[in-house]
């Protein structure tokens, strides 16, 4: 930020994340701290906080959400998990997300450069509809020609497994990622 000020950057655009806060997971706290530092920097800034981003499965070795779900959950010889809190699975897979395509996020970045209304403003970005985890799993399965059978999976079991296994690279999700997944990831306004 100091260098951006020094060289006279006209607008600093930051990719943050939906759900950032000072008391969240390490990822959420780090993103929140970056947002706060930029807001206090003296720069002209715009912050985008997208919901779940999908698209571009060839993106420089970074995991793409739908591809990762297909490979890590739908290609296995057992049902896809529908996570739930509590003792009974009545709400299995019911948390929601507003997925947004990476190209839409990129368009917002580009368009914001010339729009005065975007200066010193934060935008939550999400797709046109909120989908439950159950619906997302179903749609990815349909699109990839995979089976769609699912089974309720209690959060407590996954968290215990994650606390033991998330240090291994082959384990598909960290404890923090799982915590954020269960919080849901929707936005109140879709841009």
Residue ranges of model-derived segments:
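A short helix->loop->beta-strand "cap" motif at the edges of active sites that frequently abuts
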Residues: 5-11, 41-43
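Conserved beta-strand edge residues that scaffold enzyme active sites
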Residues: 18-19, 52, 155
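Short secondary-structure boundary segments
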Residues: 16, 184-185
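Mid/C-terminal beta-alpha module of Rossmann-like enzyme folds, strongest
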Residues: 106-176, 187-191
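SDR active-site strand-loop-helix element
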Residues: 12-17, 48-50
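Oxidoreductase cofactor-interface core, primarily capturing Rossmann-like NAD(P)-dependent enzymes
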Residues: 23-138, 142
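Short, conserved SAM-binding segment of the class I
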Residues: 2-3, 37
């Amino acid at each position: 930020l100091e260098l951006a000020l020094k060289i006279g950057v006209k607008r600093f655009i930051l990719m943050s994340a939906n759900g950032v806060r000072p008391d969240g997971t390490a990822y959420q706290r780090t993103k929140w701290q970056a947002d706060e530092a930029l807001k206090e920097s003296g720069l002209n800034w715009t912050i985008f906080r997208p919901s779940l981003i999908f698209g571009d499965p060839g993106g420089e070795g970074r995991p793409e959400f739908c591809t990762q779900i297909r490979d890590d959950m739908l290609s296995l010889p057992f049902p896809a998990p529908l996570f739930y809190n509590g003792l009974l699975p009545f709400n299995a897979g019911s948390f929601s997300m507003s997925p947004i395509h990476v190209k839409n996020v990129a368009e917002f970045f580009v368009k914001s450069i010339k729009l005065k209304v975007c200066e010193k403003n934060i935008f939550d970005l999400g797709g046109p509809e909120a989908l439950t985890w159950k619906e997302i799993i179903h749609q990815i399965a349909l699109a990839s020609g995979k089976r769609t059978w699912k089974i309720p999976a209690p959060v407590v079991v996954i968290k215990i497994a994650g606390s033991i296994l998330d240090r291994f690279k082959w384990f598909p999700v960290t404890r923090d990622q799982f915590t954020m997944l269960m919080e849901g990831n929707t936005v109140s306004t879709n841009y």
